[in-house]
Amino acid sequence: MVENFEQDDFDMLDPAAKQVLAALSQYDRGLLVKVDLLHRKTGLMPEGMNDAVRHLEKSKLLAVLETPKRLGPYEIYAVEITDLGREVQAKFG
């Protein structure tokens, strides 16, 4: 999978998205991370967090828990790093 993701693809990621990916890679595989915990780990404000998560989800580097529940100003409730996200972070991060 990671062979389809190149250094240029990683370099094009927003710095906030890279920060979110790095923070998520510290958690065990299969663990959902609530957005408020991710905020504490990254220090990103809601707009930056929402943008980073949308970008990473489009790139298939993380999965968003589909739920109507939201935490405050965040558009999401919880996320999980994908296997591709782990591989990309390990290779390029």
Range-by-range predicted roles:
Residues 1-21:
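Short alpha-helical segments that sit at the start of domains
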Residues 77-93:
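Short, amphipathic alpha-helical interaction segments positioned at domain boundaries
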Residues 22-29:
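Short, locally clustered residues in the helix-turn-helix/winged-helix DNA-binding domain
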Residues 70-75:
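Short, solvent-exposed loop/turn segments that connect beta-strands within catalytic domains
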Residues 13-14, 31-32, 46, 50:
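Alpha-helix N-cap/helix-initiation sites
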Residues 57-69:
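A short, conserved structural fragment
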Residues 43-59, 76:
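Short amphipathic alpha-helical interaction segments
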Residues 29-41:
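Short acidic, hydrophobic short linear motifs in intrinsically disordered regions
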